[in-house]
Amino acid sequence: MLEFFSRLSLVTKIIIAIILGIGVALLFPTVTPYLSLFGELFIKALKSVAPILAFVLVLSSIANFQVGHSANLRPVLLLYVVGMLLAAFSAVIASLSFPSTLYLNTVSHNNLQAPGSLADILKNLLLSFIANPVQAISEANFIGILAWAIGLGLAMRHSSDTTKQVMQDVSHAVSAIIHKVIAFAPVGIFGLVAVTFADAGLATLESYAQLLAVLLGTMLFVALVINPILVGLTIRGNPYPLVFKCLKESGITAFFTRSSAANIPVNLDLAERLGVNPSTASVSIPLGATVNLAGAAVTITVLTLATVHTLGIHVDLATMIILSVVATVSACGASGVAGGSLLLIPVACSLFGISSEIAMQVVAVGMIISVLQDSTETALNSSTDVLFTAAVDIRSRQNS
């Protein structure tokens, strides 16, 4: 029995865990307090690895970022950045239009205050930026972690290849630890679902359904509206034939593999069939799998604003714009690790003074809905890589 269960995919295990958790909560509610330990251990493990994960992934991503391989690379990068920002903005609008409420254990966290004026927010950001790096990691100050990771990453871009390889190896090592933690996700989610449904009842299903609807709806909006607008402006023509071809041949594969990296060969093959210059595609598509993560920006923004709404924190437009930028930067570090976008949510939550403990509960909620969220996110991310690469190549051929 155990051998059969071990052979199942993580998605299947999580689905089974959710069903069992709901069943136990409804049939044996008196047992659920004893199951809370599983959820607490899972959240504690996530809370422990998240700071070093954010630091190493962003540092390695920036240190190994190379520009100048192709004349067409700069406009592709511009599309990547603009696309992620617009995806984050779309997530803000969707979250404001359809606010979601999460079931969180907020006992002893009722002293949270709304951010003050824009000047206060910027002041707090600057103070967080210059925090001691060791202290930032130990206290889970994700803004400080992000600042040091970006600064050191930029400084190390001109270091030797050996140093960069060491950073990549460290990143892979941290990712390996994350994979071990994520492997226990079904057990943790079982405990979390059982306790949550026992405490909140079937109303929890409605909450998760709305959250999923906002997430998936925003990603579809990005794929079918935002991306076509950007591509249409680039190629100066009807973008939808190219958009649908990329979604069909790249997005569907990525949906089931749930890995942008694993989908790189699919994208390279599609780019070749679309007649894209190999010197451009060979760089921009692997690079896109690392830094072009519009779906991750949507996930980080939606879940953060759902947390803000749940805690009753009022935020103004300026703060939301800052959140969109932070979500975009954080998304660049989410590649290559299971649940990467979810594990970078604390970076965005720290903007609003939300504790790491609550942020990790939000990550756990994200894990519960990740069966659909992660697949759709990967489909958007990976199909966008080849879409923008092909669009820029078409534009360059038009100009030649």
Swiss-Prot record:
Catalytically driven reaction(s): L-serine(in) + Na(+)(in) = L-serine(out) + Na(+)(out); L-threonine(in) + Na(+)(in) = L-threonine(out) + Na(+)(out)
Top-level taxon of origin: Bacteria
Native species: Acinetobacter baumannii (strain SDF)
Family: Belongs to the dicarboxylate/amino acid:cation symporter (DAACS) (TC 2.A.23) family.
Official protein name in the record: Serine/threonine transporter SstT
Compartments it resides in: Cell inner membrane
TM stretches of this protein: 14-34, 48-68, 76-96, 136-156, 177-197, 211-231, 293-313, 334-354
Keyword annotations: Amino-acid transport, Cell inner membrane, Cell membrane, Membrane, Symport, Transmembrane, Transmembrane helix, Transport
Mode of membrane association: Multi-pass membrane protein
HAMAP family: Ser_Thr_transp_SstT
Function: Involved in the import of serine and threonine into the cell, with the concomitant import of sodium (symport system).
GO terms classed as biological process: serine transport; threonine transport
GO CC terms, sorted: plasma membrane
Any Pfam family: SDF
